[in-house]
Amino acid sequence: MILRTNDMRSNIGFVVIGRNEGSRLIDCLESIKKFAPAIVYVDSASTDQSVHEALTRGVHVLELDMMTKFTAARARNAGFSMLLKLYPELSYVHFADGDCIVNESWVEDAISFLEQHPQVAVTCGRRRERFPEASTYNQLCDIEWNTPVGKAKACGGDAMMRVSVFQQVKGFNAHLIAGEEPELCI
């Protein structure tokens, strides 16, 4: 079953995490707002205008308490909880880092894939460095992210997941400072 745009918009929510992302966050939010109104931005004590920029775009914002250690897993879990309180009917959640742009065709492709493969819990695409030529580090990131296409044992931080399965496994392990996505997929 292929979802029509209106069905898709009511079925999916986004959790975006970040800290001091600046214009990268603006680009991220602009790339996803056309797909769904259900967007939560989780901010980890930004000192720039990230929170203001998200609010200006009509995005729900959750500012994490600085008394507890920041981790991507903690931020994603908190954002997911807020998202479901606001939009309890969602079938899919897309997690994204605030410095990432979601490709125009990705969301519909991801939902279509999950609809056609009910045994699959999560799908992710090819993450690309926006400016691989800018530095050796950027180039190495782009090379590292060039993972094989097809069935995988794990996903990265930018992925579409079934809400029911994410709830069933009780989210990411918030105690991990990194690698929470592969651990979730075990």
What are these regions (language model features)?
Residues R19-F35:
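Short, well-formed alpha-helical segments that are part of the catalytic scaffolds
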Residues R24-D27, D48-R57, E63:
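Acidic helix N-cap motif at the loop->helix transition within catalytic regions
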Residues S31, D43-H52, M66, C100:
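A conserved acidic beta->alpha catalytic loop
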Residues M66-K85:
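Glycine-rich, basic loop-to-helix element that forms the pyrophosphate-binding segment
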Residues Y87-I101:
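Short beta-strand-to-loop acidic/aromatic patch adjacent to the donor-nucleotide binding site
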Residues I101-T136:
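Conserved donor NDP-sugar-binding/catalytic core segment of glycosyltransferases
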Residues E129-R130, E144-M161, I177, E183:
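A recurrent flexible, glycine/aromatic-enriched loop bordering the glycosyltransferase active site
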Residues V165-K170, H175-I186:
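A short, conserved alpha-helix in the catalytic core of glycosyltransferases
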